[in-house]
Design a protein with these regions (language model features):
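Active-site gating/metal-coordination segments in enzymes
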Residues: 166-170, 174-245, 299, 305-307
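Divalent metal-coordination and catalytic microenvironments
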Residues: 64, 149, 239, 300, ...
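Short acidic/histidine-rich active-site segments
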Residues: 248-249, 303-305, 326-340
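N-terminal secretory signal peptides
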Residues: 1-9, 22
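C-terminal segment of N-terminal export signals and the immediately downstream linker at the start
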Residues: 27-50, 54, 103-107
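Disordered, low-complexity segments in secreted/periplasmic proteins that are enriched in proline
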Residues: 32-36, 82-119
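Histidine/acidic-residue-rich catalytic or RNA/ligand-binding cores of hydrolases
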Residues: 71-75, 161, 256-262, 284-293, ...
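Metal-cofactor-binding active-site regions of metalloenzymes
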Residues: 89, 96, 116-121, 125-126, ...
Length: 383
């Protein structure tokens, strides 16, 4: 595909990288192009109300962030990450025949083509218990050009759905609640003994009671376990029953990305309803797995952006754009503060590399709405 690169002098590149937050909003929202078509009756289900997709066309939607996690999440995350690093062997061979194997990346990833922890992992004191503070964070994000944020928490990670409702009400920023079950280290003990049918029923109850707008982040922590496969199959079936879109967590992207997509497709999920997450951790100049995900119709989630891993991700994004996959990319930060950094830090680096505002608008505004919008199969239970 042509039209993504433009001549950029060194001085212009420096100026673009140095763009301030004030410049981020018009850069994302001023692109003049026809938006995507949505099915009749499609909504984006936020916690406080359902939105027509057109209502959120004025800014970016961040598809994977965190605004509520339990007080013990950091400790559990650190322990699970250490266990995964201890178990991971050498980097896996690429799944095709590109000349170089993928190397670890995405903010200090461990051997194995990525790790569970990433630059968006929480560290230090938990700031997620102050509604006013979090509301100010979202107001700042809105001023940076964010129209909507998807929270990737779950009951098993300590996500407080009422906290999110209060934050959305105070900030005026729509929050879409993800849900489901996270990954093996976080599963309730009864998951192992529950049947797949029982898990599907539990998921649908959760979607109704918590007013979910997506399933996610749904993860495999290291090698996909039997319980994780069962949960992924149940998520696929719950999607068929609800139409809610799905976004995933890949602990070792090179090993699990395509298997996750296989399981979901086998359960009846169309790939265009799925974002395979953390693929910035799979650093591969040939973007082999990334291209397969795109060709199959799913979205590649570069969702730990706005930090040190950007240097690895920008060339991969450029390769995917040049291959014609702009319609299959999603960007976010997977963070707990500073939610606008995808727009204010990462996008200027892409502009400096030659990406046009029209393409960035497609990715940040159109792709995310196309993925999030769904025609409900069940009535909204909570106003």
């Amino acid at each position: 595909m042509t039209g993504f690169r433009s001549a950029v002098t060194r001085r212009q590149a420096i100026e673009l990288i140095a763009m301030t937050a004030a410049a981020a909003l018009p850069s994302v929202t001023a692109a003049q192009q026809r938006g995507p078509d949505f099915p009749k009756g499609a909504v984006i289900r936020a916690l406080l109300k359902d939105y027509a997709p057109e209502d959120l066309a004025g800014g970016a939607t961040l598809f994977h962030e965190h605004m509520s996690l339990g007080a013990d999440f950091n400790q559990r995350f650190t322990a699970a990450s250490a266990a995964a690093r201890a178990l991971n062997g050498p980097p896996p061979a690429p799944l095709g025949t590109p000349p170089a194997a993928p190397r670890a990346g995405g903010g200090g990833a461990a051997p194995g083509g990525g790790r569970a922890a990433g630059p968006g992992a929480p560290a230090g004191p938990n700031p997620m218990s102050d509604v006013s503070l979090m509301a100010r964070e979202l107001v700042d994000a809105r001023n940076d050009g964010v129209a909507c944020i998807v929270d990737g928490g779950h009951p098993d990670s300590g996500r407080d759905i009422n906290f999110l409702r209060q934050v959305s009400m105070m900030s005026g920023v729509p929050i879409v609640a993800g849900g489901g079950f996270y990954a093996q280290p976080w599963y309730p003990t009864e998951i192992s003994s529950m049947s797949e049918n029982q898990i599907v029923d539990a998921l649908i109850r959760q979607a109704d009671e918590d007013t979910l707008g997506a399933w996610g982040e749904i993860g495999s922590w290291d090698e996909i376990t039997a319980d994780e496969r069962k949960v992924f199959r149940a998520i696929g079936r719950a999607h068929v029953a609800t139409n809610l879109p799905i976004f995933t967590h890949t602990g070792i992207p090179g090993k699990s990305a395509l298997e996750q997509l296989d399981i979901l497709e086998d359960a009846g999920v169309r790939p265009g309803r799925v974002v395979i997450g953390h693929l910035g951790n799979l650093v591969d100049a040939n973007v082999y797995v990334h291209k397969i995900v795109c060709r199959r119709g799913a979205y590649v989630g570069f969702d730990r952006q706005g930090g040190g891993g950007d240097a690895n991700v920008v060339p991969m994004v450029m390769s995917l754009l040049e291959a014609g996959y702009a319609d299959h990319l999603m960007f976010s930060a997977d963070t707990m503060r500073g939610y606008g950094k995808t727009l204010t830090v990462f996008l200027p680096k892409l502009r400096a590399a030659g990406v046009s505002d029209d393409v960035l608008h497609k990715i940040m505004v159109d792709n995310s709405r196309r993925w999030l919008a769904f025609v409900p199969k069940r009535p909204r239970k909570r106003a």
